[in-house]
Amino acid sequence: MKNLKLKLTFLSLCAFATAAHAQQVKGNSVLYTSSQGNMRIEMCSESMFRVTKVPAQQMPDNEKWMVVNYNFPQVNFSVDGKQIKTSKLQVSIQEAPWRIQVADASGKVLYEELTSGCKDSIYNEVKMNPDEHFFGFGERMDRIDQRGQRVHLNVELGRGSKPAVGGKDILRANYCPVPLMLSNKGYAVFFHTAVPNDWDMGWTNNDKYSFSAPGGDNDYYFIYGEQLEALIHSYQQLTGVAPLMPRAAYGLHIGSYSGGTWHHESKANDTYVVNLIDRLRQEKIPFDMMWLDSTWRLFAKLGNGGCTFEFQDQFKDPKGMIDHAYKNHVAMFGLHIRSLVDNGKRNNLLTTAQKKGLTIQDGGTNAIINFFDDKAVDWWWKNAAKKVTDLGAKFFKTDVGSALNYNNPNIEQKAAHNLFPIAYAKAPYENFAKLNGQRGFDHTREGYAGIQRYPFIWAGDWGSEWQWFEPIIRGGINIGLSGVGYWSHCMGGFEQYSAYDTDLYLRWVQMGMFSPVSILFGMDHPRYHAPWTYGEEAQKIFIQYDSLRYALLPYIYTSAWDMYKTSRPLMTPLFYDHLQDVNTYQISDQYMFGRDMMVCPVTVKNALSRPVYFPGGDWLDFWTGERISGRQYKSFLTPIEIMPIFLRRGAIIPRQEAMQYVDERPNTNISLLIYPSEHSVYEMYEDDGKSLDYQKGVYAVTKMESRLAQNEWILNITTPKGDYKPVSHYYSVSVYLDKKPKLVTVAGKFVDGWKYDEKLRLLTFDAGEGDMEVLSLIHI
């Protein structure tokens, strides 16, 4: 394991006997010692601290894969014996064994450890409140609220009894586990361990929960925050934020097996890809990103599990194929790879890497590149990846990040298995950023705490069946709560086990176009989920939702900026903003997309209607304009072309003209869709869409402020503020008003061409150029 250059120190923890204690305060750290063991409290802020318990003076080393920030400014706190106080928290220390109780500033107990430690593993046992609920834990497909459940976190495929159809078990699916637990009681626990860990959330005893990691360290962060957003934001202060992707990556991604999937590899060829690109453009299907999946690769000794970085012989002109993609406005062209290298016809990658000691000695093929080692990454990039980047590849799909499995693994090797997906995604992400001179991009399947930095996960290989559809939605909700905001899935499912189901395909596509990232891909040879294979009507509906996503790109991109600033995921459960409404805790087939749009996928075959729960506040039907009061269930008709979508009162939704690709033309014309409240503010975000200059403050924000009074509605649009200079916008406005206006003015001038739809109660008018402040005044 030494060759991994992965330094992890594991210290077993024993139960502490009663002994005299001493305390030492140094900087942000408070160390409590006794003859039987020590505990260190490290203050990160007035609402977050780290707890480490060890049997001796030595503390574990700081690893660099999960947590990237260990240095915090001096925190204002006081220590009085076994009491630590900040302006927000009161921490009480108890020993024999060392354990803590945490209360808020008012003295309300949030977290109370009952016991801690064991002989062969570490654990903390915590008192559980009768009405406490638990969320997070990574990309869980089983449920949203884990109260009363047992959760095992280890990067792996689904474990357990194999279903009759397919090979996955949603109860144990762990493509991207994250040891982060969020409580509705205003706190979170981030278990800082890469060792496989277990969470008993009231399964064994309904008045307490525990988290443990056999053989690992008792090392965790306690995070306080009244809102989930504050908890996730603090977690990302430790593990890193999700960076903005290239703007084109918010458009549609197309994956292709090049005409030949598994058992049809010989049919894969570059002509198929060229024709596919042409057909997509001919059919007016908007898309920006494309990658070729496994069958572009020449398979050698290791079969489809190894990567030769050589195209199959049927690809006569790979560079010409990629050039054709760029000529037809594909923004980024990528390739599927594996972490194992293999010898091909021209490249002896495996032999060379092994001779140089750049592969991991896993007791098996010994073919996995040691992505933990900078030297190995540098060699891999220059001698393997460069074979295809020279042809024009601009990103990789890094598949099977779970490949690192040891024979007879020890604790350090078990930890390496969980950290490997991060190192595996980091290498191409950072190198492509340097090569392309713009934002990095990588498309990966597995992850662990910190994977959000590189930057997105897809849900893996789930079947094209109704039984997997709603679990996929749960996975997206859960992974967002776990700090991974960019997430996607194969629209329509991946593996085709049963007869083609147009209803399932379209319902999945509708939801997929309202996911953080939209991917069209599947291995259903020879159709591959191409919309035209499902018929003319299906293609029409596909284009309807694809075009809607492109029209909403100003809203989606602004929501991505919001996530970068505040850590709010693009896709959130209803309880994210309504923690006091327990009705929302079990809802896994509705979610918020951004702050203002509620999406309600249809997850039942041939459903003619579906019930929708509305949290507190007022809502508006995106399709019909119907107003709905909150805190109630209501049923809606769902013909195949309709997925229920609702706007939150106060919403200001910027839209652009639908385009065939993101940069088809400047987004000069901005249409605002507004469901006004008494007062709401929206800030539309813009930048160059490609560079990292936004991290230096080079961006523009246009503030839009809406005010509704008894007899008037006012919209104020300011000039863009910031160092980036966007194109001048021409604004049109659609605003839902219950009464027909008497007159409309813009910038003090009467508007004659306004229209009011009595049925929808919708006013539309042109607000004009936005290169100066625009004030619209509607007298009602």
Residue positions per predicted region:
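TerminUS-proximal long segments
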Residues: 249, 331, 529, 547, ...
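N-terminal accessory segment at the very beginning of proteins
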Residues: 3, 21-243, 247-249, 255-257, ...
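Solvent-exposed beta-strand/loop surfaces of large extracellular or lumenal domains
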Residues: 61-75, 358, 622-640, 745-767
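Bacterial N-terminal signal peptides that target proteins for export
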Residues: 1-9
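Catalytic-domain carbohydrate-binding cleft regions of carbohydrate-active enzymes
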Residues: 108-642, 647-648
